[in-house]
Amino acid sequence: MSGDSKRSIEIYDTTLRDGSQLEGISLTVEDKLRIAEQLDSLGVHYIEGGWPGANPKDDEFFERAKEELSLETSVFVAFGSTRRAKGKVDQDQTLANLLGANTEVVCIVGKCWDYHVREALQTSLEEGVAMVADSIEYLVANGRRVFFDAEHFFDGYKNNPEFSLQVLEAAAMAGAERLILCDTNGGTLPHEVEQAVGDVVEHLDVGVGVHLHNDAGCGVANAIAGVKAGAIQVQGTINGYGERTGNCDLVAVIANLTLKMGYETIPEDCLSRLTPVSHHVAELVNLTLNPQQPYSGSSAFAHKAGLHTSAISRRPDAYEHVDPEIIGNGTRFVVSEMAGRSTLELKANDLGIDLDGKVLGDVVEVLKRLEYEGYHFEVADASLELLMRGASGWKQDFFEVERFSVDMNHVGSGSRAWNEISVEVDTRAVVDLFVDGKKMVGLGDGNGPVNAIDTALRSVLTGSYPELKAISLVDYKVRVLDTEKGTGAVTRVLLDSTNGEANWTTIGVSENIIEASWQALIDSLVYGLLHSPHRDMPQSE
């Protein structure tokens, strides 16, 4: 570690503005308020709320934030731009909106690349500098702390370093507390960031920050390079959300700077919030978190090969670069055809299932055979648990299915894509089963076979197991495993289910898609009943 390794690095989150520019994200005001609460619980230093005056949504957000947000650790920031070219600061609506937001800190963006000043603003370089200086001076005079986002700094510094430094000098002289060097196009490489940041830190006696995009895949690496060169603030977003390919991921930045380089970032007792906040924000922006997301992804500390899991059972640090519990994640053992006895034994132990001796070896062989047939248990933990419990001697006694049938009535002809005649499909399922020794018949109508079968099962089972009312199917995935066989190919079905508190995935494989769906559905209901809070978990025999 370097001699300054314990200096504090400010974490500035711009998920609510820059992060929301990612394709596919559209935040409501309520979403933004909830995300701000999550960021505050994480202990970031600054939360950029958005651009007041830019749209009605941001205006409402800033108004509600004044009344509804009680931040304990974070400082709220309003974002905007410099005055217009040839304009006056006291007549500029953007600056007026910034003051109207009533935040302690404002962050304004200004051009730092001569090419943009001439071509985008279509004004002189002298006026470009004046726009920055005048705006900062005006905001400071009105009692605001000002951060200056030097837009396109790294590209500008390559092209005309004298002008880029002149803009920064003017911003510092006008009273900016932080000079944020922005890689707006995201194409700068780490060695270039380190050199440029080092030059600015040496040249100016004002705190320097970095704002990195990920277009070259270097967002996090560039943040680290900037800090090494003397930057004291990193701007980024949770999970790296942002326009185009995103911004630098603050989850990885915080973890790397804190755990690997010894810098102080967020409060130490907040590090365990990194993974929960990462997942919570993903839910709020309505995007599935990448399982391979560094540090916070569900696969970040997952181990599939038997050799790895065998070593981890003895020495966790053998195949894990940090202790996952520090950042709120955990070790996960994935069972697949690559897994050996040690992987399966660790998985069983986690679930409280005794699979010692010959039984363990038999289960390993069964799993390998099933995976060869098309099962994929590493993404279907619920079905895997039921299989292992069955091998240990447990038998599910919630219900016993005798038979089921599905009828479909199709009215109309042809494809809806080209046929103007309306097409109607009615589906009915009949299920014969035993509950508590009594034979019962369930009937169910639905918009498809799976829905109809689910309805038929519930029509009988809910009377004995009212907890099924809380269980719902949230996703249904079908994959054809051998496309060369056409309509006769083997199909794999994955069902995602929830009871409102936990989620689980089950699997079915068959040449018949309805049979594959049936397998996954039965596993889903059995697993949900098994893990009902009203029921004790079974013990291995």
What are these regions (language model features)?
Residues 5-9, 15, 255, 261-436, ...:
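A mid-to-C-terminal "edge-of-domain" accessory segment
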Residues 9-11, 17, 21-47, 62-71, ...:
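Alpha/beta enzyme core
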Residues 72-79:
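A glycine-rich helix N-cap at a beta->alpha junction
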Residues 181, 236-243, 258-267, 327-333, ...:
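Short beta-alpha connecting loops at secondary-structure transitions
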Residues 185-188, 195-314:
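Catalytic alpha/beta core domains of metabolic enzymes, predominantly
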Residues 343, 445-463, 512-528:
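Stable alpha-helical structural segments in soluble proteins, enriched in small hydrophobic residues
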Residues 464-498:
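Generic long, charged, amphipathic alpha-helical segments
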Residues 500-538:
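Mixed-charge, glycine-accented linear interaction segment located at domain edges/termini
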